[in-house]
């Protein structure tokens, strides 16, 4: 049943698109495919080789909304784990009828110990070549994957507290961190998640995020922002994530506090400034710079 499948997200086996389907993804994917941020080969893991594309078969496709699906792919062996760590992403690839490769990075939010299969929540974007291709896959068809690419290697209690600022499908690496921290009883890191979307219906993984926040009330805070909503029914924030809100919610800059940012270009511009490339964080600008944060205090996925 659909409810059963969604409930499994609470022990998150899920993957969702990395930072949205933007034109920037094309350049990023090409750079990722030749980068050195890969995990060395290990047995019992499906994704271990930076030079090997692995075809996985789609076993289940479940409609969640008009433009979002839950897809389940089988790993190479039923006893395999994915080989992913927090925080890392995979590349996906398909070949167009004209013979062109379409490659996009996707961020996993799956439990690193999950065996046998890997799940995605895919949001279809207008004009998005990869999201449209994946969205239209039929059960029994395959998709090519490669990786994992390590973005930030999380260690328990790296910081006393962190802030996760995201928008849209940029929630994926942030959720990955949130889940990893709260799944480890020895990790006491406090987490403040600030997540923006167009409407309440666009919020990915909301039930799973809310469940984590409810279970870890002394460790996790969550703030939702939407552009528009029925004010009589919506209990979150309406409007943009502002500098004034961040000034009120964030801790003062320091070595024990880290801010992680992931989202569409507009969010980066307003909050932190964009990355130059997958390996170049670029200069810190935007609201965080205005609030006194320095480059070393912020990580952009």
From Swiss-Prot:
Domain FAD-binding FR-type: from-to ranges: 51-155
Signal peptide residue numbers: none
EC number: 1.6.2.2
Annotated keywords: FAD, Flavoprotein, Membrane, Mitochondrion, Mitochondrion outer membrane, NAD, Oxidoreductase, Transmembrane, Transmembrane helix
GO biological process: one example: ergosterol biosynthetic process
UniProt keyword Transferase, yes or no: no
Highest taxon of source: Eukaryota
UniProt xrefs under InterPro entries: CBR-like (IPR001834), Cbr1-like_FAD-bd_dom (IPR008333), FAD-bd_FR_type (IPR017927), Flavoprot_Pyr_Nucl_cyt_Rdtase (IPR001709), FNR_nucleotide-bd (IPR039261), OxRdtase_FAD/NAD-bd (IPR001433), Riboflavin_synthase-like_b-brl (IPR017938)
SUPFAM superfamilies linked: Ferredoxin reductase-like, C-terminal NADP-linked domain, Riboflavin synthase domain-like
Cofactor annotation: FAD
TM annotation in the entry: 14-30
Leading EC class: oxidoreductase
GO molecular function per UniProt: cytochrome-b5 reductase activity, acting on NAD(P)H
Subcellular location: Mitochondrion outer membrane
Membrane topology (UniProt): Single-pass membrane protein
Presence of the UniProt keyword Transmembrane in the record: yes
Catalytic reaction(s) noted: 2 Fe(III)-[cytochrome b5] + NADH = 2 Fe(II)-[cytochrome b5] + NAD(+) + H(+)
Record-level GO cellular component terms: mitochondrial outer membrane
Family of the protein in this entry: Belongs to the flavoprotein pyridine nucleotide cytochrome reductase family.
Protein role: May mediate the reduction of outer membrane cytochrome b5.
Protein known as: NADH-cytochrome b5 reductase 2
Organism of derivation: Candida albicans (strain SC5314 / ATCC MYA-2876)
């Amino acid at each position: 049943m659909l409810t059963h499948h969604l409930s499994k997200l609470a022990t998150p086996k899920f993957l969702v698109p990395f930072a949205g389907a933007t034109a920037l993804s094309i350049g990023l994917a090409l750079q990722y495919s030749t980068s050195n941020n890969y995990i060395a080969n290990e047995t019992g893991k499906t994704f271990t080789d930076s030079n090997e594309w692995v075809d996985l078969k789609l076993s289940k496709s479940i409609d969640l909304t008009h433009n979002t699906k839950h897809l389940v792919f089988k790993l190479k062996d039923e006893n395999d784990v994915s080989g992913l760590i927090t925080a890392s992403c995979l590349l996906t690839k398909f070949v167009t009828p004209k013979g062109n490769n379409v490659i996009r990075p996707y961020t996993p939010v799956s439990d690193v110990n999950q065996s046998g299969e890997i799940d995605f929540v895919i949001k279809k974007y207008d004009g998005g070549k990869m999201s449209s291709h994946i969205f239209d896959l039929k059960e029994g068809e395959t998709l090519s994957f490669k990786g994992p690419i390590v973005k930030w290697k999380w260690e328990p209690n790296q910081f006393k507290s962190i802030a996760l600022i995201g928008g849209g499908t940029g929630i994926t690496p942030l959720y990955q961190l949130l889940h990893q921290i709260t799944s480890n009883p020895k990790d006491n890191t406090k987490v403040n998640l600030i997540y923006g979307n167009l409407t309440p219906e666009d919020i990915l993984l909301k039930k799973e995020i809310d469940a984590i926040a409810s279970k870890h009330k002394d460790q996790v805070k969550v703030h939702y922002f939407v552009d528009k909503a029925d004010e009589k029914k919506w209990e979150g924030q309406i409007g943009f994530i502002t500098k004034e809100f961040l000034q009120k919610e964030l801790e003062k800059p320091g070595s024990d506090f880290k801010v992680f940012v992931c989202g569409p270009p507009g969010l980066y511009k307003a909050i932190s400034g964009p990355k130059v490339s997958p390996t170049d964080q670029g200069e810190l600008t935007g609201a965080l710079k205005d609030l006194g944060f320095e480059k070393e205090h912020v990580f952009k996925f």
